[in-house]
Amino acid sequence: MNKQFLLASIVAVATPVSAMAQSAVIKGTVVDSQNNEPIAGVTVVVQGTKVATITDENGKFSLKAPKGAKQNLQFSCVGYETQTLAGGQISGDRDLGFVPMSQTSVALKDAVVTTRAVARKTPVALTTLGSVVIEEKVGTADFPKVLESTPGVYVTREGGGYGDSKISMRGFKSENIAVLVNGVSMNDMEWGGVYWSNWAGLSDVASSIQTQRGLGAAKVSTPSVGGSVNIVTKSTDAKKGGYFSYGMGNDGYNKLTFNLSTGRTKNGWALNLLGGRTWGDGYIQGTDFRAWNYFFSVSKELAKNHMLTFTAFGAPQVHNKRSNYDGLTVQGWQDVQQYMPYKEKYRYNATFGYDNQGRVRHSAQNVYHKPQIQLQHLWQISNTASLNTVAYLSLGYGGGESGMGTAAYNSSWYGTNNGVLNMSFRRADGTFDYGKVQDLNEKSESGSQMVMTMSNNQHRWYGLVSTFTKEMSERLNVYAGVDLRSYVGTHNNRITDLFNGAYYIDSYRANVKAANNSAAADPLFKYQKLSVGDIVRRDYDGHVNQGGVFGQAEYDYNNLTAFLSGSLSYTNQWRYDRFYYEKSKAESESHGSLGFTVKGGVNYKFPHIDGWGGQHNVFVNGGVISRSPYLLSSLFLSGDVSNEINPNAVNEKIYSVEAGWTYHTASFNFNLNAYHTIWQDKAMARSLDITDAAGNADRGLINMQGVNSLHQGIEAELDYKPVKWFSVRGMLSLGNWIWTNNAVGYFYNSQGQPLADAKGKIASGIYADDHAKMTLNQKGVKEGGSAQFTASLGFTVYPMEGLRIGLDWKHFSNYYADYSLSGRDLSINGVKNFETPWKVPAYNLVDLSAGYTFNMGGYKTTISGNVENLFDQEYISQAYDGAGHDWQTAYRVFYGFGRQMSIKLKVNF
């Protein structure tokens, strides 16, 4: 970059003064095409002349070009594709406005595996958010909040605890969305989902977020169905300096963050360090939280063409939750007003309470730390080839609280049952009476009837992703790579509190068969008196080993770009159970399966039609995915308690096609696309509420195989900045997501045992003749759980230097309630006819953000603030369909958050 600066300066000074009198001033601002952030250090040359300059730190440039001749402007910068603007005859001064530049796919300075697609070149639907947008919009919300204005994306906070948000994309839930950090997968290896509370600090270190909807173009061997979210962290080539920030918000929200960067030193070293702490009371009653986050990255240029980067990041946290099962009916929420003021009732938490000593108690606390360590080697083999290798290690520690009890009292831990408030242990003020639990256990002559356990989930996960990229010619680029992973997850429950009881007898021990574990042959085995620290319910390891290869060829000829990619992966999975099996029988059979993807697409870029910038593109892509079954709820139907492998487990198949059109100028971008996705042989589980013969409530599930669905829709988004002091961004997404076949489901209780009837009788085995099953007639029925129509429109105004004011409107509608089942639906060889679920009322939200940057004592300082749900709109964000398919029978209803406010001070140094 220094050489470019020197060259450009010499050329500019050498330009004859006499020519300046015969010249015109050309100026503009160069921005990143993906996030509209200004690019400093871009060399701007008037081709055929010696006129050149470079952009300043705000991306601005100004030069004087000779009048009278036709000239082209060339823009070049390390890490970006050279851009040439074909200009007409230069007759006078002109302002080009914003000039976008696209990032190159091979750049030594980018010491991360980005898996980014290039806008308007790669034929996929994508949206990129830069660090500025992330910082402006996140406020006090969870990290996924910033994706709400992305087409096809729906974000819900579920129970409302810290980091408990969930994302769906094009109607596909989190286990079908690939989440990557620097190109490394974050999805759980056993079931595919992501817990965002484990990554709550990513908003502080993210330089960009790119969502690729549909099959995408990410460089991994295992595919996504709904799309991918790739988070790229800040690299070590940041300039020297740092910042300190403090933020505060409603409900005791506080956040401290510091960042320090050395910049690139003369000997090739660079260090970037970030740390932060967040704490608060939580918007929902009794959901206080304490969280920390850290990011450490150090890199070294080993030689001219080699760079080694070590990165470690994590976000340890402790937060109390509101169970996802503890939503009420619509009327139930109105009745809660007897316990909480009118405006507060939607914050109610059915399991928040006190014990006899006046201590605050919870039954849904989550504690977790999932650090990830990455070591990356980037080798620029030549000007046309590079090898990028990342080895990583992830270690997970922690778990979540889970109340347990005898058959008569296990359901007493539930805050609600089928949307109805559980009154068994309810105080007059509506809080849960943990003191009554203590009294019950103290009086019991058979030990504690109700205890608290910690559901521990630990893992050891390591892997390697290596990608070789080669520019075969000016027209052909190829890449190929390997993706290797090894994972072991340990899961058990340990007693943490006897609630004043003398001991506890684990009812799950009665399910241990002597044929599998000889200890169960002892009549006293199931009556053993257990205490704090003892294991109950389950104790097993889930093993997943996966290896894959992937590759892509991209052909670029004039205005046509085409790509063909594929991947092949082999997954081997098994269980090792220490609770239900003795050592000689603890390890299950292993199950291996082969998965693959084939994707292809073309993009055509029409010639410039507006002289200096107007550009039309059209693209089409399609592909096929065959995905191996997940270990839980597919390969092992009773994954917590049994080594028995599902004999009917098959790969899921996905077929998708997509087409789109884009138009962009230096100041205006518009994207329009349509998609059609067929999903076959999906494995799916739904919750189940039953009542046993003794009248005790229980929660289980129905496991379905061979479910088919159709997801299709239209998406549009625009980004317009006509003048430097005003910009507008909007999107619209219309989906049509339906089930396309009738599925067969088998029933299990909360202990993972197959059920024979609606009263809790245990079947003789999985898929045995007496195993209760049911045909679910759902063909043609709308899928629930996500808004099928979303829209947003955001305005940002810069009324004076340093001041920013933003207003965002968001609309959500066509949200159909999800479904679960109850014991009244359960019958051997029965049929359940589904109808169109209840459509939740549409709602609109408005968010306000503002910031002012100024100089304070020589330090760049920013004061910013956010107001979410500015007008305090009441709305339903999540619901399950009831028997009447209406608001009166809908249950597990959650209302969204009311008005949230925050303010932050950030000082750069």
Locate the predicted segments by residue.
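A beta-strand signature from Gram-negative outer-membrane beta-barrel systems
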Residues: 97-99, 200-245
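Gram-negative outer-membrane beta-barrel transporters
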Residues: 556-559, 676-678, 700-821, 906-908
